[in-house]
Amino acid sequence: MQHEPNGHPTLAHRPRRNDLHHLDVYRCALELYRKVGQIVAQFPRGEADLRSQMRRASRSVPFNIGEGVGKRGKARAAAYEVALGEAKELIVALDCVEIDQLAPQGELFAAQNLADRVAAMLTKLIRSAEAHSL
């Protein structure tokens, strides 16, 4: 079994607690949260507001995915829509980070690609949830 530096099993090797951990979008959202945390940790002191906003948005994506898994139909779609909105907000924030040159291009590119992927997956989940609510 693989472990994180703190000694806990990695997410990939923890026993599955529910359907949430089987969702690729959830795992990708957690990875995005991790990448954003690494990026904002490098910001200068004057960027505290942007750092806080990006941490909040990146944390909100997996939270709302988790909330959606526990719901059905339109309520599920609504939770996924909130997650999508937060992912889109994060995409804009990452664009601002790129313009302001606040993070290494490689790290930023990886986070941007992952944010785009999460947004695309959420869009599909929203369509699916809406189709099942009819």
Regions found by a protein language model. Give the residues of each.
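Amphipathic alpha-helical assembly/interaction segments
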Residues: M1-L134
